[in-house]
């Protein structure tokens, strides 16, 4: 498993924090967005959308969204639950995440 990151970008930072909080040992590859490394032919093979974060697997599969990566890691490494323990907690956390992403992050992008 490899995590394609960019230290200065906000979306991969969220995944990087998630990985650290769960104490997951994963190979991290920094992608230099300022110099256009995400547009290179090599990176386009990994993610044709040319974005980070990316979590890639030995079989060639990839996850390319913070939500997808977090969901996968939460299911794969449940010992440190970050997305809630009970159904109520999971629902409240999902609701808060949606609110942050839609009302907070989307507003900042405008």
What does each of the following model-derived ranges do?
Residues 1-110:
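GST-like domain detector, emphasizing the conserved glutathione-binding G-site
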């Amino acid at each position: 498993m490899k995590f394609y990151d960019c230290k200065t970008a906000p979306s991969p930072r969220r995944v990087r924090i998630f990985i650290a909080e769960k104490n997951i040992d994963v190979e991290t590859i920094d992608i230099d967005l300022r110099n256009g490394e995400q547009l290179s032919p090599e990176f386009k093979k990994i993610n044709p959308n040319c974005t980070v974060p990316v979590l890639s697997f030995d079989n060639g599969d990839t996850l390319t969204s913070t939500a997808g990566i977090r969901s996968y890691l939460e299911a794969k490494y449940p010992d440190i639950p970050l997305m809630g323990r009970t159904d109520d907690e999971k629902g409240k956390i999902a609701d808060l995440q949606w609110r942050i992403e839609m009302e907070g992050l989307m507003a900042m992008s405008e």
